[in-house]
Regions:
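Alpha-helical tetratricopeptide repeat
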Residues: 1-127
Length: 127
């Protein structure tokens, strides 16, 4: 099978398994997709997989690993407020409030209407 089709298959099946809360199987599919990221694949698609994998790791309470995925995604797309939000969320859960505040502030700067980021930032400020 064509490797580009295989990449898309891994991503789409990963999404399905994540939606079904089969997080370990979803992770396996996202890992397989990222193994093919050496191909000339659209960068937005690579960011999507890092985001999906990072979010799946958050559901599994693997916050440090999720941060690594969000670091990679942000390196590719530093203008995506959701990436900064989720990395900030992971930092907040790990009680790394300074890093969380920094990421959530960046998220709000990129999207001033991102109310969830504002709420989490307020929550940290009230601790």
């Amino acid at each position: 099978m064509n490797k580009f089709f295989k990449f898309n298959e891994y991503v789409e099946f990963g999404k399905v398994f994540k939606e079904c809360e089969a997080y370990l199987i979803a992770l396996e599919h996202f890992d397989n997709a990222l193994e093919l990221s050496y191909l000339p694949i659209n960068k937005n698609r690579i960011v999507e997989v890092y985001d999906l994998r990072g979010n799946t790791k958050i559901f599994l309470s693997r916050y440090g690993d999720a941060i690594i995925d969000y670091n990679k995604a942000i390196e590719i797309d530093p203008h995506n407020p959701y990436l900064f939000f989720w990395r900030g969320f992971a930092f907040e859960v790990m009680q790394e409030y300074q890093q969380a505040t920094k990421d959530l502030s960046i998220s709000l700067k990129l999207d001033p209407d991102f109310t969830l980021a504002k709420s989490l930032l307020d929550h940290i400020a009230n601790k």
